[in-house]
């Protein structure tokens, strides 16, 4: 198994975001954290920033949605340039998370589920077929 490197844009200097993206050009992915202030206490970057980053790099962009009801936004993130979109299993009902994953796949993108640190690993079991 090979190790993949995905530096997070969240650690970049936003005044120099283009240069920050270019500085990680040898990485395997660009990691893009999205926080809504509800699912997690912080608020971060969104779709317009993703669109700008997509213009600056050919690297695959891994979008980590830390938002409530992610199925409302997965189409927009896919259209904005995401190559891989991950949703938290805790962010909605299992049916809605399945819907989000189906929408991501319908856009031809890779999909995944992620867990908060205190969530039991078994919580991903209903999603393994995705």
Q: Where are the regions a protein language model picked out?
A:
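Glycine-rich, proline-tolerant flexible connector loops at the mouths of alpha/beta enzymes
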Residues: 30-45, 91
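A short alpha/beta connector and helix-capping loop motif
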Residues: 38-70, 74
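N-terminal beta1-alpha1 ligand-phosphate binding loop
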Residues: 8-20, 35
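Alpha-helix termination/capping residues and helix-transition junctions
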Residues: 23-26, 79, 128-130
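Conserved, mostly hydrophobic/aromatic
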Residues: 17, 24, 32-33, 77
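Generic N-terminal amphipathic, Lys/Arg-enriched alpha-helix
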Residues: 1-7
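Conserved anion-binding
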Residues: 2, 13-16, 56, 73, ...
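Conserved beta-strand positions in the central sheet of alpha/beta enzyme cores
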Residues: 6, 29-31, 62, 84-86, ...
């Amino acid at each position: 198994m090979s190790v993949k490197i995905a530096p997070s844009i969240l650690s970049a200097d936003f005044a120099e975001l283009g240069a920050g993206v270019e500085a990680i050009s040898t990485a395997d992915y660009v990691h893009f954290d999205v926080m809504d202030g509800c699912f997690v206490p912080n608020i971060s970057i969104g779709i317009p920033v993703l669109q700008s980053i997509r213009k600056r790099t050919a690297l695959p962009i891994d979008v980590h949605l830390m938002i409530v009801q992610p199925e409302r936004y997965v189409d927009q993130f896919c259209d904005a340039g995401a190559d891989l979109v991950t949703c938290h299993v805790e962010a909605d009902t299992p049916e809605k998370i399945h819907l989000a994953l189906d929408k991501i796949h319908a856009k031809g993108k890779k999909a995944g589920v992620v867990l908060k640190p205190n969530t039991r690993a078994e919580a991903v079991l209903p999603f393994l077929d995705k």
